[in-house]
Amino acid sequence: MVIQRKYRASRRLGVSLWGRSKDPFNTRNYPPGQHGNMGYKKPSDFGKQFGAHKKFKFYYAISSKQMRNMFLKAYKKKGDTGDNFVGLLESMLSSVLYNSGLVPTIFSARQLISHKHVLVNGKVVNISSYSVKPGDTIKLREKAVNLPSVLAAIDAQEQKVPDYLEVDVKERSVKYLRVPKYYEVPYPANMEVNLVIEFYSR
């Protein structure tokens, strides 16, 4: 199953990245390919930085190139680089949709977007990395509101909706209120943005 293969990232990194009950890490908290729980090797400083980079990359389901471009953009902006970086990541259309709890995974969010099932202020947007602005309203199109994955996500309520989003479950919509700071994002895992900054600053 595609989602299960993607969840292998949790086992590779030694954390439950998305905090989901179906995450294989919950029952097999050791690296994939390893027979039995022999634990994880203690990483070097570079290993810690690289691991932090990987956690963000997999959590948001983006490429290394996208990650680097976002970091460079965050670095050039005024203010705290870590907050800027996370703010850009959380402003992606796929992130807002996933954090709304209207979809079960970041992967399903990206799929709905690419299949043109998502509206931003009434217009179809099919780019997952589209930057949502404060005040924008994201809504599922009519043909997607009762998809099994959407109904299952709403029923499960596994996603903690952050304060910077306003969700209307009945309307299958979410309003992006503001760009969050790093500390405001309810990551299920320990996401060390300082190590990502160190990784890109080498």
UniProtKB/Swiss-Prot annotation:
Pfam families, per the entry: Ribosomal_S4, S4
Keyword Repeat: no
Signal peptide: none
Domain S4 RNA-binding: 91-154
Keywords: Ribonucleoprotein, Ribosomal protein, RNA-binding, rRNA-binding
Assigned GO CC terms: small ribosomal subunit
InterPro entries named in the record: Ribosomal_uS4 (IPR022801), Ribosomal_uS4_bac-type (IPR005709), Ribosomal_uS4_N (IPR001912), S4_RNA-bd (IPR002942), S4_RNA-bd_sf (IPR036986)
Gene3D superfamilies (alphabetical): Ribosomal Protein S4 Delta 41, Chain A, domain 1, RNA-binding S4 domain
Biological process terms in GO annotation: ribosomal small subunit biogenesis; translation
Superkingdom per UniProt: Bacteria
Molecular function per GO: rRNA binding; structural constituent of ribosome
Family statement drawn from the similarity comment of this UniProt entry: Belongs to the universal ribosomal protein uS4 family.
Subunit note: Part of the 30S ribosomal subunit. Contacts protein S5. The interaction surface between S4 and S5 is involved in control of translational fidelity.
Primary role: One of the primary rRNA binding proteins, it binds directly to 16S rRNA where it nucleates assembly of the body of the 30S subunit. With S5 and S12 plays an important role in translational accuracy.
NCBIfam families: PRK05327.1, rpsD_bact
HAMAP family: Ribosomal_uS4_B (MF_01306_B)
Name the UniProt record assigns to this protein: Small ribosomal subunit protein uS4
Species whose genome carries this gene: Ehrlichia ruminantium (strain Gardel)
High-level lineage: Bacteria, Pseudomonadati, Pseudomonadota, Alphaproteobacteria, Rickettsiales
